[in-house]
Amino acid sequence: AILRILKEEGCGVDCSSKVELTMAEACGFKGQEIMFSSNDTPEEEYIFARELGGIINLDDFSNIAEVEETLGTLPKTMSLRFNPGGYFKIANTIMDNPEEAKFGMTEAQILKEKGVEHFGIHAFLASNTVSNEYYPVLARQLFQLVVRIKKELGISLDFVNLSGGIGIPYRPEQEPNDILLIGQGVKEVFEEILVPNGLGHIRLCTELGRFMLAPYGALITKVIHFKETYRHYAGVDACAANLMRP
């Protein structure tokens, strides 16, 4: 029901498995409304994603050969997951520590040589940030990469997927994110970096499922077990199968 409402409101879907692709298909999502981001991916899932016309988002350099071998040829539109490397800091707090590999530049060149015509980049560096700075900082890094790809490779990207990461306040002392302020921050970076370089056409995508939905429902559970190790654990009669992203 929720997916159908999102479909009616013009949203797309982010899928990472055959089950999620199947749910997307059942709700009427198709083509570039679907972003397929997966790792350790079975061949049949690449095939299914292509059948639906979804955008396959590559997570690793080795995925290029895997997709080409599985599908026989690379799709005309593909996306690359970018990892900027180093420490990612927001408000003096380390949000994540991506590995050093800067996946994006070399891979874009290879895809171009193999016939891919439309490109996008994607990044997922942090989860459930309660900070208005995260998205604008991430956008700056991705937009700078977009400009480099255009200048050094002659490739003009079609879209940038900022992924998720904007969280909600689970604790009373936490301040909620200001989505209008976040949006304005991304807009300012867009106009500062992309527009002057002739890239104002680029489409921006987000994956804000938690931010959009989590505040409007509740999972009620009962504590059924306690465990004492180096921490105190309370086990409940629910699991990720009941609510994957609370």
Placement of each model-derived feature along the sequence:
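C-terminal active-site-proximal or functional interface alpha/beta core segments in diverse enzymes
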Residues: 127-130, 134-246
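Active-site-proximal beta-alpha core segment in soluble small-molecule metabolic enzymes
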Residues: 1-159, 168, 189, 227
